[in-house]
């Protein structure tokens, strides 16, 4: 052998801990929240995470001599305390660009959250943030169309869009499902939506649902003079069936389809996003299963990472939480997610949980969707939090109206337009929301009844996944 080779086991920190390293613009950067096993030093635990997620195995191997290990290895380059948690620490890791296939989210995350999450050296591990360098961003497809193209397609400007998830989510016949879609769209909504687990069950096969929904859309468009849509869920057992359903949605004239991007898999979702771009179809993305991955504040993947990877994979809409509704979502963190979905360049901001600058270049933005336990009383806060480029999706907050679906839709439309008008006049809609809605209800009996129905309904539970204390 030309080089000497020393077999055996070495501490990871001898090779992968480098506190003097300055990250390069081309590096993929990651920050992990690490809880090491008792007796494992922080530097060793950080280096172990770095090693297992890049080039190492448990022992030295002679084939290390056949490559430039110093070039390809990851480097754990910094450690920080986690405020308010004596057991955990943040480990910052830099990965060289040569480790990853261009444009492959699957490849990147197979390394970053692969075997390392079962590593015995750590008790718990959470991927808090990832900085994707511009070279990597430009090799990814991104959203099929983006916000501006969607507005142009639908001829809707100057306000958020309104949607509704049809309830009950399971059990309706296709004909009754289509009836609910028609009533909601006729009442003033822009979109209605399949729920995440509506696929092709015995009570409502997918083709029947698609046809009745499209009939409802066309009838509502004729009566209102507005462009309407229904998120037809093409999620299916295999990719061939996903394409078959998507093609049928296109044939009947639907402007938008949807998928459950975590349960169908990232490679499948990326393929569907490419199909949508090629076929002029908007793509709504549901995040079903995300709570399994992101809700535990000590183990898993933070949703800000899932939001970033969805923008890279491709999607025109993504559920982002509401802050004010029934689902998990810290306000500061949610605003950080929304910026990552919509802005061209997002600066590091620890107060919102953003550990790195994130450049997006010219990649199209994603429309955040606020959905889950919201009703007319939430409208002022939703507008203040999300602004115009968002979809506010009221399921029970539409279909639960005492006068029916159309009245629920009308109440939401009147509430939204009243808040937008007040905002445009310079009023503080969040602070003055009650007065704004009360005034609007004087000329809208539908809104008045909705306000009376949900006056006492609140979801005041503490957030489980909070930003770490001093960053708030």
Curated annotation (Swiss-Prot):
Query: Which keywords annotate this record?
Result: Calvin cycle, Carbon dioxide fixation, Lyase, Magnesium, Metal-binding, Monooxygenase, Oxidoreductase, Photosynthesis
Q: In this chain's numbering, which residues are marked as the site (Transition state stabilizer)? A: 326
Task: Identify the enzyme class.
Answer: lyase
Catalytic activity entry: 2 (2R)-3-phosphoglycerate + 2 H(+) = D-ribulose 1,5-bisphosphate + CO2 + H2O; D-ribulose 1,5-bisphosphate + O2 = 2-phosphoglycolate + (2R)-3-phosphoglycerate + 2 H(+)
What cofactors does this protein use?
Mg(2+)
Q: Where does substrate bind?
A: 115, 165, 169, 287, 319, 371
- Residues carrying N6-carboxylysine: 193
- BP-aspect Gene Ontology terms: reductive pentose-phosphate cycle
* Listed EC numbers: 4.1.1.39
Q: Which residues bind Mg(2+)?
A: 193, 195-196
Cofactor: how bound: Binds 1 Mg(2+) ion per subunit.
Tell me where on the tree of life, at the top rank, the source sits: Bacteria
Q: Which GO terms describe its molecular function?
A: magnesium ion binding; monooxygenase activity; ribulose-bisphosphate carboxylase activity
Q: Which residues form the active site?
A: 167, 286
Self-association state and partner proteins as the record states: Heterohexadecamer of 8 large chains and 8 small chains.
Cite any additional comment in the entry. The basic functional RuBisCO is composed of a large chain homodimer in a 'head-to-tail' conformation. In form I RuBisCO this homodimer is arranged in a barrel-like tetramer with the small subunits forming a tetrameric 'cap' on each end of the 'barrel'.
Q: Which family does it belong to?
A: Belongs to the RuBisCO large chain family. Type I subfamily.
Q: Which PANTHER family match?
A: RIBULOSE BISPHOSPHATE CARBOXYLASE (PTHR42704), RIBULOSE BISPHOSPHATE CARBOXYLASE LARGE CHAIN (PTHR42704:SF17)
- Please give the function described in this protein's UniProt entry: RuBisCO catalyzes two reactions: the carboxylation of D-ribulose 1,5-bisphosphate, the primary event in carbon dioxide fixation, as well as the oxidative fragmentation of the pentose substrate. Both reactions occur simultaneously and in competition at the same active site.
Protein name in the entry: Ribulose bisphosphate carboxylase large chain 1
Which species expresses this protein natively? Answer: Rhodopseudomonas palustris (strain BisB5)
Designated gene of the protein: cbbL1
